[in-house]
Amino acid sequence: KLQLKTLLLQRAKRELEREEQERAGEKQRHLGGLCPPPELEGLGVAQLQELCRELHARIAVDEERYDMGTRVSKNMAEMEELRRRVAGGRFVRPALRRVRLSADAMMAALLGSKHRVGTDLRAGLRQVRKDDAEKESREVGDWRKNVDALSGMEGRKKKFEAPGGGQG
């Protein structure tokens, strides 16, 4: 059994090495198709310098792209770590305090500090005067006094309110 296992492992190792070589050859063929070697024969000094400048510019652009990609991936990893810490509860959340804002401050916060809006929110409200309320209460009081007169029972009510009560 042991010999069979070693033979299988040796065969698998040879196949892995062969696959690795095939991958390397495929990579070389692919890169050769993407970036053909520059033809430098028959070029003058000025043309060679121009070619070098062009290649240098391409390399600089690729470096910037790589640097930006690295920064983005680093920031994404940091944000993910912070999310995990918040979800895990190890990150201390600050205690939030209630802040009272006036209407002007709220509008400034919503519209931005550039817009100065002095809106008076009480302008649309109806104003009630105390005089009107007092007149209504007087009218109600007068009406209650006249209930007996309007009901037509003035005389009969007096009989019941008399000291003798009308009986007897």
UniProtKB/Swiss-Prot annotation:
Cellular component GO terms held in the UniProt record: troponin complex
Region described as Disordered: 128-168
Domain of life: Eukaryota
Keyword entries, A-Z: Actin-binding, Muscle protein
GO molecular function: actin binding
One Pfam family matching this protein: Troponin
Biological processes, Gene Ontology terms: cardiac muscle contraction; skeletal muscle contraction
UniProt KW Hydrolase keyword: no
InterPro entries membership: Troponin (IPR001978), Troponin_I (IPR050875), Troponin_sf (IPR038077)
Compositional bias per record (Basic and acidic residues), positions renumbered to this chain: 128-147
Function text: Troponin I is the inhibitory subunit of troponin, the thin filament regulatory complex which confers calcium-sensitivity to striated muscle actomyosin ATPase activity.
Quaternary structure note: Binds to actin and tropomyosin.
Protein family (similarity comment): Belongs to the troponin I family.
PANTHER family reported for this sequence: TROPONIN I, TROPONIN I, CARDIAC MUSCLE
Name of the protein in its database record: Troponin I, cardiac muscle
Species of the source: Gallus gallus (Chicken)
